[in-house]
Amino acid sequence: MKVLVNNHLVEREDATVDIEDRGYQFGDGVYEVVRLYNGKFFTYNEHIDRLYASAAKIDLVIPYSKEELRALLEKLVAENNINTGNVYLQVTRGVQNPRNHVMPDDFPLEGVLTAAAREVPRNEQQFVQGGPVITEEDVRWLRCDIKSLNLLGNILAKNKAHQQNALEAVLHRGEQVTECSASNISIIKDGVLWTHAADNLILNGITRQVIIAVAKKNGIPVKEADFTLTDLREADEVFISSTTIEITPVTHIDGVQVADGKRGPITAKLHQYFVEEIVQACGELEFAK
């Protein structure tokens, strides 16, 4: 397996990171995950635009142009012969010696890019059957719009969900539902798609954006606004979404069944529309439902 370290492809076991890299010591960096179908990137520009936007919000300069970055990632994908899978990439602020919370102003650090690509098939069964989630207080910082390497709050919530055999932890600040530990959450109520506004309390998911676009295109009303735990529990349908899980229905919340416990009709339609977008961009999907 080859991985990318700056502009070099190296064997996974030969890849190294400096112990005083600020990403390693502080989580000082940003990242993205881009999906591949039939060897082609899906919503690539949207992901990379968000990467550069996240970097700008923390005054981090990515040492490659968008064109240079794409060429590097395409080489990575080709070298590993990825058909359906994920590309994880991150950029840290670079190495600072000695370690210091304060970013140096006397010389610019050179950002460090790393990336890896892996074959990850679509989970058709999960897209149809869905699964349970739990709710958990959102204890993360207040700039969740930045796709930062600082993920400890997400990790703790996701691990708690895993320990309870749940797909996800739905995060909430008091009564206000925000998102999940590694995905966005949406509800359907009276035929309306309802999801949290794209503000500082959530990451504006790329899959979330595609879902909103296809909903509007196909006449499904969309409401981007706060909703509560009560709204969540009284919803007609609930689903989670992300680059890696596409649109996955929620069957139970904290052990309580959602409606009839099956994927709802609007959720199914939205996933159909979403798959159509993938097919248009990347070609036909084997076993797509």
Swiss-Prot record:
It comes from Listeria monocytogenes serotype 4b (strain F2365). The modification N6-(pyridoxal phosphate)lysine is found at residue 147. PANTHER family: AMINO-ACID AMINOTRANSFERASE, D-ALANINE AMINOTRANSFERASE. The keyword Transferase applies. It is an enzyme of class 2 (transferase). One of its GO terms (cellular component) is cytosol. Belongs to the class-IV pyridoxal-phosphate-dependent aminotransferase family. Substrate binds at residues 31, 99, 101. This is D-alanine aminotransferase. The gene is dat. Its EC number is 2.6.1.21. Its cofactor is pyridoxal 5'-phosphate. CDD domains: D-AAT_like (cd01558).
